[in-house]
Amino acid sequence: MKISSGAINFSTIPNQVKKLITSIREHTKNGLASKITSVKNTHTSLNEKFKTGKDSPIEFALPQKIKDFFQPKDKNTLNKTLITVKNIKDTNNAGKKNISAEDVSKMNAAFMRKHIANQTCDYNYRMTGAAPLPGGVSVSANNRPTVSEGRTPPVSPSLSLQATSSPSSPADWAKKLTDAVLRQKAGETLTAADRDFSNADFRNITFSKILPPSFMERDGDIIKGFNFSNSKFTYSDISHLHFDECRFTYSTLSDVVCSNTKFSNSDMNEVVLQYSITTQQQPSFIHTTLKNTLIRHKANLSGVILNEPHNSSPPSVSGGGNFIRLGDIWLQMPLLWTENAVDGFLNHEHNNGKSILMTIDSLPDKYSQEKVQAMEDLVKSLRGGRLTEACIRPVESSLVSVLAHPPYTQSALIREWLGPVQERFFAHQCQTYNDVPLPTPDTYYQQRILPVLLDSFDRNSAAMTTHSGLFNQVILHCMTGVDCTDGTRQKAAALYEQYLAHPAVSPHIHNGLFGNYDGSSDWTTRAADNFLLLSSQDSDTAMMLSTDTLLTMLNPTPDTAWDNFYLQRAGENVSTAQISPVELFRHDFPVFLAAFNQQATQRRFGELIDIILSTEEHGELNQQFLAATNQKHSTVKLIDDASVSRLATIFDPLLPEGKLSPAHYQHILSAYHLTDATPQKQAETLFCLSTAFARYSSSAIFGTEHDSPPALRGYAEALMQKAWELSPAIFPTSEQFTDWSDRFHGLHGAFTCTCVVADSMQRHARKYFPSVLSSILPLSWA
């Protein structure tokens, strides 16, 4: 290392060194003029002193305080310090020459070069953050060299003593850093001094305002090889930056915003890293050390390098604190387990995936011993907090999502404490999700919650039948979840075989329809009817359906078919034609009821019924017409003379000359918010309404195979006629329009079955304007 003697900043030299220089001046001012050329250590005794005309060493003993201050590995090297003086001559004449200020500066430089730069790495490490010793040796916090066992990451440049005026404000430090970073970006090779930002002050600096956008971009420019030791980043914003091979030892990063900040191959030992709660995305630490660093409980440590911890005391923070060890890292804990602390520290399901549980678990698997030890310390803290079941209840899911998995299941202490927690969690799942769909499982749920539920059903096999709704959902998601492991799928299949063998289940599967048609599941295809749900009211009733059908009924779309299943009673198939889906779901299979009702409320056909059949004048008919929309077939028929006459009295005024009256047409447009819609949009809606009234007139609802209510046929045809007037383009062809019209009226020998007409029109609408059809046609008719 070259040191410019004239560039030493005297303010950085310890006072004891200044005193030493003063002492040297006093010893040499009497009669000697000298030129100081070097300072060196030696154990060699002086043979000669003050020989004029020759190089002569002058021996001075370093004060003990200086030796104690620098603490080199071998203190004997400071026992004697020799200053070589050239061309000493007698100057007893007047004007005796003292050592000049320039020579004093050179003595300072030489002393620092020998005793600081070359020998006292310990001092550099503790006081300035200079590089550790070569060969994988670093210096621990107790000033003892330690071998890192290959875990110490690449480090930033060592201390430079080149003189520069230190910036006086955070803004000046920011300007200096911007200049250095831009020079590096331009391809300039920076010196160690250029990259030395130790003791810098970046408080309240938003780095996105001082650096080009390329440094905040994904895979953008990198801040590489800088020394930020002993620096202050409090309240700064370093979000989206990438620091590589940088040193942050002894720096303060309190309340710093570091969303998506990357620290790679860096030394972040002895750092206060309590970043701001406004940090949205966790910072990442890749091949980075955090020895004795204080970390918030919401961090991702997946790339951290751990070393062996030593017996140092926990860090001191304002307001006090409670801490646990995670390897050689310190994790902050709450002083008391209050309700807010339980939620903030443990509930990652409520805090964007962040908790102390996830922080510990984020370490690589090779640190399983350290992870288990930290979790045991956490459990001890929770146990000592004497938390009630009510306090633990909101975080049961978060707790089992981590602690019910390896390696923590290897700990007897954790298993014993977690057992009751897992039992209460399972009971709550059974109570909550037996009658309603589970949330659509994401990766977290598939990998962390489903295996826990499988384990709970394995321990409590009776729950498979008593809570068939939940059990079948769990098996369904285990078999179809893309993020479920093969082990999870294998365990799910094995548990389902146990379920099928249960006396309440087995009578329903030997009918030549289940699974592979011989009573066994066929998991090779999602079309096989592998699932059998037991009625929540009657053990003799069961529903058999395929994987795809079960999935879509739990998470329906407007096109979902609600009758694509087998209904079993005492092992025999039962027709669903006369069964109302809503009643079936309400009574026997409530797991589908909420989804069915939610889809049903999006169907707006009933608004037209309320226009035609007001509850004040036609309350009974109104209820009959609406009730008929809840089933595929109705036992109520309206073909007797009294019914035909009553319907004619209601519908004839709406159809003067067989067409929709202008006033009634405007009522329809208003009810369906079509007043300002395009003619095509209006036509599509009228077409779908016509389809529904064709269904009313058919044998499936109010008609029979040989007769149907004329008023309903006429109204259906009038709706279709108006749709044709508005937009003929929505019809397949003019010939098809004429054919449908003839069928409604029985003209030209056309087949008059309106059930056929309704089906044909419905298929056309589903193909060309499905969203309109799905918003109108009753769900049971879809």
UniProtKB/Swiss-Prot annotation:
Q: Which residues form the active site?
A: 753 (glycyl thioester intermediate)
InterPro entries the record matches: SopA-like_cat, SopA-like_catalytic_sf, SopA-like_central
Annotated Low complexity bias: 157-171
Name a Pfam family for this protein. SopA
The protein's organism comes out as Salmonella dublin
GO terms classed as biological process: protein ubiquitination
Give the GO molecular function terms: ubiquitin-protein transferase activity
Q: What keywords would UniProt list here?
A: Host mitochondrion, Secreted, Transferase, Ubl conjugation, Ubl conjugation pathway, Virulence
Origin, by domain of life? Answer: Bacteria
| Known catalytic reactions | S-ubiquitinyl-[E2 ubiquitin-conjugating enzyme]-L-cysteine + [acceptor protein]-L-lysine = [E2 ubiquitin-conjugating enzyme]-L-cysteine + N(6)-ubiquitinyl-[acceptor protein]-L-lysine
Q: What happens when the gene is disrupted?
A: Mutants are significantly less enteropathogenic that the wild-type strain in intestinal ligated loops and are impaired in their ability to promote polymorphonuclear leukocytes movements across the model epithelial monolayer.
EC assignment: the record states: 2.3.2.26
Spell out the Gene3D superfamilies in the cross-references. E3 ubiquitin-protein ligase SopA, effector protein (NleL), HECT-like ubiquitin ligase, Putative secreted effector protein
Residue ranges, annotated region (Disordered):
137-171
Protein family: Belongs to the SopA E3 ligase family.
Q: Where is the signal peptide?
A: none
Q: What is this protein called?
A: E3 ubiquitin-protein ligase SopA
The text the record gives for the protein's domains is: Amino acids 100 to 347 are sufficient to target SopA to the mitochondria.
Please provide one cellular component term from the Gene Ontology annotations of this protein. Answer: extracellular region
Q: What is the lineage of its organism?
A: Bacteria, Pseudomonadati, Pseudomonadota, Gammaproteobacteria, Enterobacterales
